[in-house]
């Protein structure tokens, strides 16, 4: 099974044509696996005394392991599916609880800070009157303002004055968003490093750089990427962060 002889593996993804999903399928096939791409929206869960079952598209879901490709759009229903799979003894690359914790920027920061992993100074703001106090707490202007759940650079803003910060927070609060005001790290302006952790080691890392005056380095915002070698210290921080958030990948 270790070499894919009898291992039945499924990739949980709503986008079988997405690049990341296709690459997982390609690499699995190279290892002699025959992966099945399963839409997480098409599971039905069954619970009875002493017994649980799960169907996908009307058929019994009979797999040994799953790789969830469920990101920022994860719902309580997706978490229920992953929990059901875990109870059936089906190994999951990431648990529903782990994905939920990592997708919420506030919750993730709380967990990392509690485990003495360095994070930018952060405040969670629910009232306009607290904006100035929050800015002072994180070290003064400029500040980064974020919604707690976002990806690909969406919902991340840099503000240079109290008035700008207050106006933005007011607008976001009116839309029902949860808002973080965060310390601006000058040395990381327009660039950051991403590490891919699998199990207990970093298997790949890259530096992302923004184009022009953009301070967000996301590839989806036309940023560029390049290979980077991480120091042992950075690798250990990345692995610890994944571990305390409950993520295998």
What residue ranges belong to the model's regions?
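Active-site nucleotide/adenylate-binding loops and adjacent lid/helix of ATP-dependent enzymes
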Residues: 3-14, 19-26, 35, 46, ...
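Short, acidic/turn-prone active-site loops that include or flank metal/cofactor-
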Residues: 40-42, 97-99, 209-210
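Anionic group-transfer/hydrolysis microenvironments
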Residues: 41, 71, 148, 184-185, ...
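Glycine-rich, highly charged phosphate/nucleotide-binding loops
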Residues: 41-62, 72-78
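Redox-cofactor binding/interface segments in oxidoreductases and associated redox assembly factors
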Residues: 67-68
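Catalytic core of tubulin tyrosine ligase-like
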Residues: 157, 171-172, 186-188, 201-214, ...
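Beta-strand scaffold of nucleotide-dependent catalytic cores
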Residues: 168-169, 192-209, 237, 241
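A long amphipathic alpha-helix within ATP-dependent nucleotide-binding catalytic cores
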Residues: 175, 215-249
